[in-house]
Design a protein with these regions (language model features):
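Short, conserved turn/kink motifs that form compact alpha/beta structural patches or helix kinks used as
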Residues: 43-94
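Extended boundary segments
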Residues: 1-59
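General helical secondary-structure elements
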Residues: 2, 54, 68, 116-124
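Intrinsically disordered, low-complexity N-terminal regions enriched in serine/proline/glycine
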Residues: 22-24, 51, 64, 101, ...
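Short intrinsically disordered terminal tails
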Residues: 5, 125-131
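Intrinsic disorder/low-complexity segments
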Residues: 50, 112, 120, 130-131
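Short linear sequence elements within intrinsically disordered, low-complexity coil regions
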Residues: 28-30, 57, 70-72, 107, ...
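Short, compact, well-ordered microdomains
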Residues: 81-124
């Protein structure tokens, strides 16, 4: 976990409620490449923003600091009231700082190097129709 600061209530940059952004693979090919790489290496690899895109946005009454504290004792999916698939990425953003978690076979792990802004610029690739 990385060190976070408690954002004061009076901070003008603070967003209430916080945003929960869920990222998924931008294409089936990106998902397959990721899965095959994990299998061939025999271990999980971190998420690469160029392979992901924003799939859903929700709201959360906790700020990033409180969320990071609570996930130590409460399951992520219970806090967010959502079921996430393997290798999805979730970001809780309160306007000042983010907590980014990556779902692995062993549970959620922090993914502070995931470039969420880059992933939000990507678009989901549509399947090409067969000619």
């Amino acid at each position: 976990w990385h060190k976070m600061l408690r954002v004061p209530d009076w901070c003008k940059k603070r967003i209430r409620p916080s945003l929960v952004r869920i990222y998924d693979f931008a294409s089936t090919e990106s998902w397959l490449m990721h899965e095959n790489l994990c299998k061939s290496l025999g271990r999980e690899i971190g998420p690469t923003a160029s392979r992901y895109t924003l799939s859903e946005v929700r709201q959360l009454d906790l700020d990033a600091y409180a969320f990071q504290k609570q996930v130590r004792t409460t399951p992520v999916e219970e806090l967010l009231n959502v079921h996430l698939g393997l290798h999805q990425v979730v970001e809780v953003f309160d306007g000042v700082q983010s907590v980014i978690l990556y779902k692995t076979l062993g549970g959620y792990i922090p993914a502070p190097s995931f470039d969420a802004e880059r992933a939000r610029q990507n678009r989901r690739e549509q399947k090409k129709a067969a000619a």
